[in-house]
Amino acid sequence: MTSPVAQCASVPDSGLLCLVMLARYHGLAADPEQLRHEFAEQAFCSETIQLAARRVGLKVRRHRPAPARLPRAPLPAIALDRQGGYFVLARFEPGADQAVLIQRPGQAPARLGQAEFEALWAGELLLCACAASPTQALARFDFSWFIPALVKHRHLIGEVLLISLVLQFISLLTPLFFQVVMDKVLVNNAMETLNVIAVGFLAAILFEALLTGIRTYLFAHTSSKLDVELGARLYAHLLRLPLAYFQARRVGDSVARVRELEHIRAFLTGNAVTVLLDVVFSVVFIAVMFFYSVKLTLVVLAALPCYFLLSLVLTPVLRRRLDVKFNRGAENQAFLVETVSGIDTVKSLAVEPQWQRNWDRQLAGYVAAGLSVANVAMLANTGVTLISRLVALGVLWVGATEVVAQRMTVGELVAFNMLSGHVTQPVIRLAQLWNDFQQTGVSMQRLGDILNCRTEVAGDKAQLPALRGSIELDRVSFRYRPDAADALRNVSLRIAPGEVVGVVGRSGSGKSTLTRLIQRMFVADRGRVLIDGHDIGIVDSASLRRQLGVVLQESTLFNRSVRDNIALTRPGASMHEVVAAARLAGAHEFICQLPEGYDTMLGENGVGLSGGQRQRIGIARALIHRPRVLILDEATSALDYESEHIIQRNMRDICDGRTVIIIAHRLSAVRCADRIVVMEGGEVAECGSHETLLAAGGLYARLQALQAGEAG
C-alpha cells in the first residue's frame, strides 16, 4: 500500500491526508484508501473531515481564532489555506519572530514568518484530539480535573461548609453581646442580666471551639483522601505517557512538576473554602452594619476598591516572578537528580568543586527568585494592612462624631467596629488568598505539561491475540521530531515466525528505532507495522508488549530481591520457573554464590553486581514469561567475553520456538542468525545470511573486515 505522503502528489485530497497524518501522530491507525472508499461521494471539506475523524477515533472541532490567539491553540491542528487546501499547523517556534512550523502532505516541514503564515491561512482551524484519551487537547487540564474527587467527597465538604456557616452566625452574636453589656448592663448596673449574658457567651465560645475542632479534623481527613486519590490519578497518567514524553524532558523537571500537585491540593482544601465563605457571608454583616449606621458602612465599603486596585496592580508582577521561581526550582531539582544519578562519573572525573560551584550558583538564583516573590507579597500585605488601618481610623473618627452627636450609643459603635472587622478581615485574607491563587495558577500550568500530554490509552482498541511471531514492516518511515531527518526511510521487512534475524549497521543507522516501532514505543509517520497480520496501531499497546521480551544494552534492576527482579512480568511465577529462566540466561551459577541466593536484595539499579551479571538477570527477566518474540537490543555489547560466551552458548535454547531480533555492533553476535539485515542511513542496505553478505563484498563485508582487523 502506498503511504499517504507518497500519494499526495497524485491525489488532491489534502484534507484527507492531513487527517491521516494527525491520526498517526495520535497513535491511531488510519488508512487513506479505506477512508477515501468510505467517503468517495463527498469532497474532503471540513465537514467531511469531521465525519472521517470520528471514524478513526479522533474528535475534530472547527475553530476560527484571532491570529493573536493562535499560539494558545492546542496543536498540531489542520489549517485551511486560501486556495481551499489543507495543511498541518505543527507549532509556533519560540522567539521574537514567532516562526510557524507547518507541513503540507507530501512535502517536508517548512518554517514561515508570521506575515507569510497569515497570508496563507484562511482563518479556520480543525482542532484534533484522541477521542479515547481522558486528557485530550480539547479538554485542557484546569480546575475541572479535580471536580470528580471533590464530588466524591461532597458530603464531607458539605459538612465543612455547614459548620463554617454556623460559625459565621456565632461570630454575629459576639458584637451583640458587647452592645448589650455596654448599653444595658453598665448603664443600669444590671448584674443579673450580665450573668445571663456571660453564661450564654460562654456556651457560644465552647460551641464555637468544638465546631472549629470538628471542621479542622474534617479538613485534614478530606485532604488526606484527596491526596491519595489525586496522587494515584496523576501517577497512573504519568505511567501511560508515551516514551517520547520522557525523552524530551529531564527527570528532575518531571519530578518538580509532579510535586506541584501538593500546592494545588493545599489551595483547594486549605483556606480557600473558608475565606470564600467568609467573603460571601460578609454580605450579611454589611446588611447588619447598614442597620447600625449608613455613614460608617460607606466608610468601610470605600476601602474595598482600594484592595482590588492593589491586587490588580501587583498580580502581573507576582505571576512573572512566580514563573521565574518555579523555573529556578525545577533547574535545581534536575541538577540534583543528575548529580546523584551520575555520582560515579562526577567522582571519577574529580569535578566535585565544579559541581559545587554550579550548585551554589543555581541555589543563589533560586533564593533570589524566592526573595523577589516574597518582596512582592510583602508589598501587597503591607498595602492591605495600611488600608485596613486607615479604615479603622475612619470608623473610629466618624463613629466618635456620631456618638457625640447622640446618633449612636457607645455599645453600637463597639458592635459596629467588631462587625466591620468581620468584613475587612476576610478581604485581607482574600488578598493573601489571591497571592496563593497566583502560585496555584503557576502550579496548574506546570502540572498541565504532564496532564495535557496524550497517553497510550487502550480505549476501544482490540486486544492482540496470542502471537505466532510473524512481523512485517510495510514501507515504514519515522522521524523523532517534525523538523528532524527521517530516522527510518521507506523500510520494508518481513520476518517469519521462529526466524532469528540479526540487525547490524553503523551507529545512528536506525537499528534501535526499528525495534522501538515494533514495540509501539513510537508510531510510524508513514507505513504500517504488522504482527501476525495485525496493524499494531489499532491494538492495545499493553497487550502487545506483554507478549514481547526485550533486553536493552543496559538492563535496569530495581531495589528488590533477585527473584522479584526476574519475575517482574510474572509476579506469581514459581521458583522452578525463575530458576529455569536464570539457567537459560546463564545467571543461575553466580546467583547461587550471592549471600542469600535468589532472595538477595539488590541495591538501586543492581548496585554490587557487575555489568555482565546485571545483563544476564535482565535476559532472564525477558524470558520468564516465555515470549513469542524476543528483542535483544545490544544486549551483549557491554558484556565481557566470558559472559558473552555464556549467552552465545545458550543462544540456541533461548531462540528455540520464538522469533528473535538481535541488534548488535559485534558481528559475532549475529553470525548464528538465519538472516542478517544491514541498516545504513535509516534504510535496509543489505539482507542475507552471513556467508551471502560476505560474498557480496558490500557494507557488511567491510564491517566484518574492520572488526577482524581490530581483533587481529
Curated annotation (Swiss-Prot):
Residues that bind ATP: G505, R506, S507, G508, S509, G510, K511, S512
Highest taxon in the source lineage: Bacteria
Segments forming domain ABC transporter: 471-706
UniProt domain Peptidase C39: residue ranges: 7-128
Enzyme Commission numbers on file: 3.4.22.-, 7.6.2.-
Alphabetized PROSITE patterns for the sequence: ABC_TM1F, ABC_TRANSPORTER_1, ABC_TRANSPORTER_2, PEPTIDASE_C39
Protein's cellular compartments: Cell membrane
CDD domains named among the record's database cross-references: ABC_6TM_CyaB_HlyB_like, ABCC_Hemolysin, Peptidase_C39_likeA
GO molecular function: ABC-type transporter activity; ATP binding; ATP hydrolysis activity; ATPase-coupled lipid transmembrane transporter activity; cysteine-type peptidase activity
Gene3D superfamilies: ABC transporter type 1, transmembrane domain, Cysteine proteinases, P-loop containing nucleotide triphosphate hydrolases
Any one GO CC term of the record: type I protein secretion system complex
Segments traversing the membrane: 160-180, 194-214, 272-292, 298-318, 367-387, 390-410
Residue ranges occupied by any ABC transmembrane type-1 domain in the UniProt entry: 157-439
Reported function: Involved in the export of calmodulin-sensitive adenylate cyclase-hemolysin (cyclolysin).
UniProt name for this protein: Cyclolysin secretion/processing ATP-binding protein CyaB
Gene symbol of the encoding locus: cyaB
